[in-house]
C-alpha cells in the first residue's frame, strides 16, 4: 500500500508558513517562496547576531573615546592607564559610566593618568 504524505506535508507547510508570518507578498503566503524567505531570514539572523556584538563594542569604544577626549586624554592612553592602575572595568561598563555619570568617569580618567 502506498503511503501518502498528507498529514506530514501539511504539518511541514504549516510550520514554514508560521515562520514566514508577516512577510510581504507571496513570501508570507506561498509555501515555496515562504521556504526560501525563511531560509534567507534565518541566515541573516545568524550573521547579524555576530555583527550586533561588533557594532555594540564599536559604539562603546566611540563613547569612551569621546568622554576621554573631553577630559584631555585619548582612548588608548586611557585604557592603558586603567590597566596599569588595576581598574578592571570592561568597555560596556565604562561606556555606561561615561554616558550617565560624567563626574565618576572624570575620577577614573584621573586615576588612569596618575598610573602612567
UniProtKB/Swiss-Prot annotation:
Gene Ontology CC: cytosolic large ribosomal subunit
UniProt xrefs under InterPro entries: Ribosomal_bL20, RIBOSOMAL_L20_CS, Ribosomal_protein_bL20_C
GO molecular function: rRNA binding; structural constituent of ribosome
Gene3D superfamilies linked: 6.10.160.10, Ribosomal protein L20
Taxonomy, superkingdom: Bacteria
Key word Ribonucleoprotein present: yes
BP GO terms, sorted: ribosomal large subunit assembly; translation
A Pfam match: Ribosomal_L20
UniProt entry keywords in alphabetical sequence: Ribonucleoprotein, Ribosomal protein, RNA-binding, rRNA-binding
Protein task: Binds directly to 23S ribosomal RNA and is necessary for the in vitro assembly process of the 50S ribosomal subunit. It is not involved in the protein synthesizing functions of that subunit.
The family this protein is said to belong to: Belongs to the bacterial ribosomal protein bL20 family.
PANTHER family: 39S RIBOSOMAL PROTEIN L20
Record protein name field: Large ribosomal subunit protein bL20
Species this protein is from: Fusobacterium nucleatum subsp. nucleatum (strain ATCC 25586 / DSM 15643 / BCRC 10681 / CIP 101130 / JCM 8532 / KCTC 2640 / LMG 13131 / VPI 4355)
Recorded name of the encoding gene: rplT
Amino acid at each position: 500500500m502506498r503511503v501518502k504524505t498528507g498529514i506530514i506535508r501539511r504539518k511541514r507547510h504549516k510550520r514554514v508558513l508560521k515562520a514566514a508570518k508577516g512577510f510581504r507578498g507571496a513570501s508570507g503566503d506561498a509555501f515555496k517562496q515562504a521556504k526560501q524567505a525563511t531560509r534567507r531570514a534565518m541566515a541573516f539572523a545568524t550573521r547579524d547576531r555576530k555583527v550586533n556584538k561588533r557594532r555594540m563594542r564599536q559604539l562603546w569604544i566611540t563613547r569612551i573615546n569621546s568622554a576621554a577626549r573631553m577630559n584631555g586624554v585619548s582612548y588608548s592612553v586611557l585604557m592603558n592607564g586603567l590597566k596599569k592602575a588595576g581598574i578592571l572595568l570592561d568597555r560596556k561598563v565604562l561606556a555606561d559610566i561615561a554616558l550617565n555619570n560624567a563626574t565618576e568617569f572624570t575620577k577614573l580618567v584621573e586615576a588612569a593618568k596618575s598610573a602612567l
